């Protein structure tokens, strides 16, 4: 209901300010409120994988840890404070959720959950078909445990950080 007739402002933390941090973005909340913004849509905020990384900074859609934040942006506590301050100022916070794939070195792979990914005939984790996707690994939504872990990560961000929703 709170999305009806709301003004949504998309934010890429890395490019929003010279510092590219949650703290620097938080300082601009009053200006965004004056502009009439109601909902802040944050582009992916998670740590970016290292394996097959594209460029120096990597692809923010190559998520390494769904419960973490990109350390370039600050700490999880910095993010928590940003969300709290945004709520005080009347904003809702939604996150661009990367649900189809993760980085090939996502913590789930390190924990031995290779079966949470689509595998090729040799048992190797697959990148999505088509395009230049070598920096991401396609998730296997037929695996119930993976779906539960994905939901758990989303619940964590809602219950522990107070995020309002996901795109």
Language model region names:
Residues 1-7, 14-23, 27-38, 44-165:
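Substrate-binding/active-site clefts of carbohydrate-active enzymes
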């Amino acid at each position: 209901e709170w999305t009806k007739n709301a003004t949504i402002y998309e934010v890429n933390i890395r490019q929003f300010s010279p510092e590219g941090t949650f703290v620097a973005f938080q300082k601009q909340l009053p200006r965004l409120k004056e502009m009439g913004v109601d909902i802040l849509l944050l582009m992916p905020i998670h740590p970016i994988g290292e394996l097959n990384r594209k460029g120096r900074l990597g692809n923010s859609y190559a998520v390494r840890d769904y419960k973490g934040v990109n350390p370039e942006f600050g700490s999880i506590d910095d993010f928590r404070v940003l969300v709290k301050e945004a709520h005080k100022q009347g904003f809702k916070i939604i996150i661009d959720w990367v649900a189809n794939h993760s980085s090939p070195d996502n913590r789930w792979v390190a924990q031995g959950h290779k079966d949470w990914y689509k595998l090729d005939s040799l048992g190797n984790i697959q990148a999505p078909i088509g395009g230049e996707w070598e920096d991401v690994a396609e998730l296997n939504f037929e695996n119930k445990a993976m779906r539960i872990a994905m939901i758990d990560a989303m619940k964590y961000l809602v219950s522990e950080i107070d995020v309002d929703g996901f795109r």
